Amino acid sequence: MGKSLYQKLYDAHIVHKNKDDVPILYIDRHLLHEVTSPQAFEALRLRKRIVRQPNKTFATMDHNVPTTTKNINHSGSMAKEQLDRLTKNCKDFGITLFGLNHPYQGIVHVLAPEQGITLPGMTIVCGDSHTATHGAFGALAFGIGTSEIEHVLATQTLQQIRYKSMQINLSGIIAPQITAKDIILAIIGKIGHGGGSGHVVEFCGPIITLLSMEERMTLCNMAIEMGATSALIAPDRTTYDYLKNRKFSPTGKNWEQALLYWKTLYSDHDAHFDKKFDFDVSNVNPQVTWGTNPSQVISIDQPIPSLESFIDPIERNSAERALIYMKLQSNTYLTDVSIDKVFIGSCTNSRIEDLRVAAQTIKGHHISKNTQAIVVPGSKLVKNQAEKEGLNKIFIQAGFEWRLPGCSMCLAMNNDRLEPGERCASTSNRNFEGRQGRGSRTHLVSPAMAAAAAIAGRFVDIRKFK
């Protein structure tokens, strides 16, 4: 029997395996940020250990950074301490740091791919749950905890169980105005918040070949929201074209050798998957979440489901609590719901293609007088490219705030957050209670849907927006 892509990557990285032990995998890339790394570095110092492979370790500042200024003192005392400690830790241990004033600084899951730090066939870890984003390149990437960060820093290895595998085959025809964000939200709505638990997901099928690398990253980024450990997409010509001539990509003969290996990274036709799921994208409409986890999602033209429609009592109780928290009612439409803020950004939707779509949507319009809207590019490279194309001017003329790169309003770890009771149309990946601030109400949407909501001051069907 053949092997799946996940099996190939896992087996290729085993460096130690006993009959009764969990295998130890070699880690090709270790990505760091300021929030989950301080304790790991402190543990290294206490044990008088060094970073085993600093040249395979990269750090950035993203979670806590201010997006209105480059002045680190404006980030708050706790955030400033974490940022200062990351600077010292990287200097002491010889690690490359993309700090606030570095020309490549950005969100870790935006920066690493665009720099060519992420490459097919690699194992990649980061102390962040959305590390699966890098799986769009055919890399086995997953989030780890602080104790595991210490272990990887010290040994460049990690003990890792072999998870089950799930194949999601995408077919059909993508309708106009439908994006990768709509597709993945619809999949999560179908499979459920825990439907991928204990599995590594591989997205495949004819639809994948039509998607850009940025769209593929959106799919893999949100696979975690169906409970998956990681997500994968086999590399192809689109992948190679994206990576060629990137800062850290191989060059010359090394590039040719890499291509030979990358072209072996696919699931064999007779590979075994523990679960298989076929999904026709033809019927996917613009999606918007109504509840407090990403699986509580509907098409914009559908009513919020009634509690009676939930057969599972646990799901029914979750829905009831979500409706109370979100201050919504069953059998009503989100197109009648006004919003307070709009956030276009995060490691899900802050890349140049996302900003182009949002800018195209709002061009010639102005945001609603009662709405605050911010755009936060995922990196300085994205920001520079957007400004080169004049997208920043379109946003500013429409009343949006054009910010500096960072995680921003995706999570309440910095100055960008919602006030209690405020409602936000957000291009981020999580809508949990309090995710964007205490008492915040988050609705996940695509960049186009978020942009249109900013103009209308409420949720609208992007297909009818003019």
UniProtKB/Swiss-Prot annotation:
Does the keyword field hold Repressor?
no
- The entry's [4Fe-4S] cluster-binding residues are 347, 407, 410
The protein's Enzyme Commission number: 4.2.1.33
Q: Which cofactor does it need?
A: [4Fe-4S] cluster
Describe how the cofactor binds: Binds 1 [4Fe-4S] cluster per subunit.
One GO molecular-function entry: 4 iron, 4 sulfur cluster binding
Q: Which InterPro entries match?
A: 3-IsopropMal_deHydase_lsu, Acnase/IPM_dHydase_lsu_aba_1/3, Acoase/IPM_deHydtase_lsu_aba, Aconitase_4Fe-4S_BS, Aconitase_4Fe-4S_dom, IPM_dehydratase_rel_enz, IPMI_cat
Annotated catalysed reactions: (2R,3S)-3-isopropylmalate = (2S)-2-isopropylmalate
Q: Which UniProt keywords apply?
A: 4Fe-4S, Amino-acid biosynthesis, Branched-chain amino acid biosynthesis, Iron, Iron-sulfur, Leucine biosynthesis, Lyase, Metal-binding
Specify the superkingdom.
Answer: Bacteria
Q: List, alphabetically, the HAMAP family matched.
A: LeuC_type1
Briefly state the protein's biological role: Catalyzes the isomerization between 2-isopropylmalate and 3-isopropylmalate, via the formation of 2-isopropylmaleate.
Q: How does it assemble?
A: Heterodimer of LeuC and LeuD.
Q: Tell me what this protein is called.
A: 3-isopropylmalate dehydratase large subunit
Taxonomy-wise, where does this protein's organism fall, top ranks first? Bacteria, Pseudomonadati, Pseudomonadota, Gammaproteobacteria, Enterobacterales
- Which gene name belongs to this protein? leuC
